[in-house]
């Protein structure tokens, strides 16, 4: 096995397996050594008793045979307990004493034994623990914990003389006693004198080895302790080896470079998004399985088991196909641009055709740099989440989303009927029946958004699209919010360490941000229909510009006093007013007056006397354009609005199946006659868009993307693929 070819994960697993084997082996050695030590104590006690009895019998026999032994009084020596004996005692020289004291074999034991018989002229001795008082150490193996600074390579290569306490205490030792009286040795103990002479040499060598070990461990232990707050008890436990060793680390990310911190944050968000999306996909997959099983269970009893199993197998194939196709990376080069059908401050909308399948889509392109500079990160994330989380027929469908170094791409369904603003420019005023139809469908569309937990906050005729059958769908969720942390600008300000932006709008403040509600001054007279038509065309151009449209925004959004879903109903009331009367309720000659009128709606709002409305229509408009506390739909939601008399006779369940007042006539699937593409010629190109396109081409040639990982943090997890569309035949 080539170690260099292994991955980091395999290396880590191999290291952990090796470490576990070493720990198990050390535990087995510890148990074996403890058993040997217990047996050793028992045998030592037994042999010591036998040797003491034999020694007493021999002395008594010598005293009876030779009176020369009586020159010294040995009765006191014989009566002493067998502890703390001097090195010259015959008991210390018995071969049985050392036969049951094997030392445990460690990594350095062989090299240690090789140095035992050196320097025979050295007579220096050292004292050790007496065998009768010997206690086994608490830890009989070299522990490699977090607190140990021992290097495994040093142990295996023999560079460090590391011995456990047990191996030290089990070495043959002798006690010296300069004051003990000399005792004449029996002739049978003479052969053991050579071993007695070698023991002081062994003791000296061991003492030197122990000193070297302590000197080597001191700098290693000082390097292992990182945190100065380690307690004295923990330090003592490290010296004795009786407790588990720990190393305390203090996190100091500020000491790292800014690039390293950005990379760490990018990895953190990537992992968070990966596991979050994995769990979400697993839940959706299980939900689809349960829905199919419930559908099969509710079918006729006569359905065969083969048919049911075939349906389950087809679902499994779709799931496998989805996982494969989901890993297919899309790029701008996979699409052919047919025509640009919309422009804005942060990007544009194109009619595109996928090269391999020929399918037609609407591609919304957003410039990343403008998202940063104009503080639109939260808005673009909210828009993507709304489109990805919805399968409602009232919301434009999102099929794919992807990104490159410069742009974000949203691949959506193409709605060839244009938008409601185009219809207002063409027809000027709607009848109450036509208004009832479109307002009723808008109620259902806004209800679908609210059920997803989002607030649109930018309901206006430009964002109400018409499909090929003439029915309504909502789009452009750039100002929507789901009250999620990623839909809050402060989240990205903290992520990117930016100063919080001041989003409070002032009457005399003109800004180019998406939150802006200011428009260019337009001089008009309310009684002049021709001037109103000019205003509408100018309004269309403002939709392409960097300024927003304040005419449909609720007053509570301006003053930042807190708002809820009821702010969308205010916008719907303003649209209803424009459909029946011909202009927005707070339209003024300049943006400052529009702003002031909305804030002072109690004095500025009025229905023209020359316009005749039904009492039901007038009442509904007034209940829409009122304070948030009294606004219709605040407490009862869409159901409360559906019960209003103005919608009497509306079939809410099948309204999408009825004939629409206007059905677009199309000559081809790429027909864009209902989009004001001619007006786009007068809209100048955004210099940032041109610069970004050049940078994108340069990045493609160099084979790389953004060099700063910090700029990619807000866009992690932006890629999306829809299951029900991707699993269709030839979806890609």
From Swiss-Prot:
UniProt-listed PANTHER family: CHROMOSOME UNDETERMINED SCAFFOLD_135, WHOLE GENOME SHOTGUN SEQUENCE (PTHR22988:SF76), MYOTONIC DYSTROPHY S/T KINASE-RELATED (PTHR22988)
Ranges of Polar residues composition bias in the record: 119-159, 172-183, 222-240
GO cellular component, one term: serine/threonine protein kinase complex
Record family assignment: Belongs to the protein kinase superfamily. STE Ser/Thr protein kinase family. COT1 subfamily.
EC number annotated for this UniProt entry: 2.7.11.1
Organism: Candida albicans (strain SC5314 / ATCC MYA-2876)
Location of region: Disordered: 111-240
Listed name of the protein: Serine/threonine-protein kinase CBK1
């Amino acid at each position: 096995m080539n170690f260099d070819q292994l991955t980091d994960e395999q290396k880590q697993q191999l290291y952990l397996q090796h470490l576990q084997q070493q720990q198990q082996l050390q535990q087995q050695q510890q148990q074996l050594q403890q058993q040997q030590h217990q047996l050793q104590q028992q045998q030592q006690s037994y042999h010591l008793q036998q040797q003491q009895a034999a020694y007493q019998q021999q002395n008594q026999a010598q005293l009876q045979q030779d009176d020369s032994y009586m020159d010294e009084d040995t009765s006191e020596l014989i009566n002493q307990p067998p502890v703390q004996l001097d090195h010259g005692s015959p008991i210390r020289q018995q071969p049985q004493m050392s036969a049951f004291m094997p030392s445990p074999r460690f990594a350095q034991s062989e090299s240690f034994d090789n140095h035992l018989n050196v320097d025979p002229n050295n007579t220096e001795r050292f004292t050790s623990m007496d065998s009768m008082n010997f206690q086994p150490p608490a830890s009989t193996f070299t522990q490699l914990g977090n607190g140990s600074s021992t290097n495994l390579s040093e142990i295996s290569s023999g560079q460090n003389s590391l011995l456990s306490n047990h191996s030290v205490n089990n070495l043959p030792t002798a006690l010296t006693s300069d004051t003990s009286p000399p005792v004449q040795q029996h002739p049978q103990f003479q052969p053991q004198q050579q071993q007695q002479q070698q023991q002081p040499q062994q003791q000296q060598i061991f003492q030197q080895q122990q000193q070297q070990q302590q000197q080597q461990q001191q700098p290693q232990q000082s390097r292992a302790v990182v945190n100065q707050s380690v307690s004295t008890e923990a330090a003592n436990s490290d010296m004795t080896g009786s407790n588990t060793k720990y190393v305390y680390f203090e996190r100091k990310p500020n000491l790292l470079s800014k690039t390293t911190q950005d990379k760490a944050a990018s990895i953190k968000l990537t992992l968070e998004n990966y596991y979050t999306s994995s769990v979400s996909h697993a839940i959706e997959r299980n939900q689809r399985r349960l829905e199919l099983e419930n559908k099969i269970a509710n079918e006729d009893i006569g359905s065969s088991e083969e048919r049911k199993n075939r349906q389950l197998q087809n679902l499994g194939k779709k799931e496998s196909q989805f996982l494969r196709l989901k890993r297919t990376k899309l790029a701008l080069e996979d699409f052919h641009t047919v025509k640009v059908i919309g422009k804005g401050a942060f990007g544009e909308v194109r009619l595109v055709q996928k090269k391999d399948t020929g399918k037609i889509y609407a591609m919304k392109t957003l410039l990343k740099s403008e998202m940063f500079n104009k503080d639109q990160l939260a808005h673009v994330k909210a828009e993507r989440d709304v489109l990805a989380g919805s399968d409602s027929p009232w919301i434009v469908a999102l099929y794919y989303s992807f990104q490159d170094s410069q742009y974000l791409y949203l691949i959506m369904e193409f709605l060839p009927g244009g938008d409601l603003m185009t219809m207002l420019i063409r027809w000027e005023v709607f009848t109450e029946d036509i208004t009832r139809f479109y307002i009723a469908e808008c109620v259902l569309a806004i209800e679908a958004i609210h059920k997803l937990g989002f607030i649109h906050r930018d309901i206006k005729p430009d964002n109400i699209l018409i499909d090929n059958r003439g029915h309504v769908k909502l789009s452009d969720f750039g100002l929507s919010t789901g009250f999620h942390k990623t839909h809050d600008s402060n989240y990205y300000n903290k992520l990117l360490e930016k100063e919080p932006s001041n989003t409070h709008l002032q009457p005399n403040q003109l800004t180019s941000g998406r939150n802006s509600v200011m428009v260019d001054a337009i001089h008009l007279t309310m009684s002049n229909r021709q001037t109103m038509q000019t205003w509408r065309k100018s309004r269309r151009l403002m939709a392409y510009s960097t300024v927003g449209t304040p005419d449909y925004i609720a007053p509570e959004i301006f003053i930042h006093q807190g708002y809820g879903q009821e702010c969308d109903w205010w916008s719907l009331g303003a649209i209803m007013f424009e459909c029946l009367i011909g202009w927005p309720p707070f339209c003024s000659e300049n943006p400052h007056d529009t702003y002031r009128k909305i804030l002072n709606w109690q004095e500025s709002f009025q229905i023209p006397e020359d316009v005749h409305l039904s009492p039901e229509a007038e009442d509904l408009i007034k209940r829409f354009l009122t304070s948030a506390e009294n606004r219709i739909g605040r407490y009862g939601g869409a159901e409360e609005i559906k019960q209003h008399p103005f919608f009497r006779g509306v079939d809410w369940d099948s309204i999408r199946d009825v004939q629409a007042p206007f059905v677009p006539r199309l000559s081809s699937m790429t027909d864009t006659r209902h989009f004001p593409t001619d007006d786009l010629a007068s809209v100048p190109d955004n210099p940032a868009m041109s610069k970004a396109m050049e940078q994108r081409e340069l990045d493609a040639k160099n084979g790389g993307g953004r060099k700063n990982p910090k700029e990619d943090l807000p866009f992690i997890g932006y890629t999306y693929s829809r299951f029900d569309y991707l699993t269709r035949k030839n979806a890609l």
